[in-house]
Amino acid sequence: DSSLVDGFSVANFLKHNQPEFYKVLTETNVTFKFTDIDTILVDEAKLIELDHNNNFRQIRFSGRLDYVPLLEENNLDLFYKARKYMFKLCNSDDFKIKFRLSKGMIAMFDNLRLLHGRTKFDPNTGFRHLQGCYIDHDVTEGKLRRLLKP
């Protein structure tokens, strides 16, 4: 089964109910790193990214890919508490929908707003195939600007 978590709603909840957590998650850069045989991807960004008007822009969360930020001890404690609480919210049914994709179905979603997850899978019970395709926002926004230009 698959699940989607609304990162915008999680961020908004934090902003209004845990402003100290929201502040540290929107101000602390975290290093994300993925390595395989062909690739080394590294990015430094905030778990909750805001735009220049302090509006929600993106959520990032990967317990396997993010590295400990270099912070003073008291700030690090706050960051970890905030990260743990955000993880709890992301796993809460209050912000998550669950669904099952059948053969031939496709799920399309905004990867900047939504977090995607899958339940554990026992390969002895069947077969699961997931194929991802990603479109960068700047590509689609650029195409939209071109189409709207007189």
Residue positions per predicted region:
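Active-site environment of non-heme Fe oxygenases that use a 2-His-1-carboxylate facial triad
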Residues: 1-150
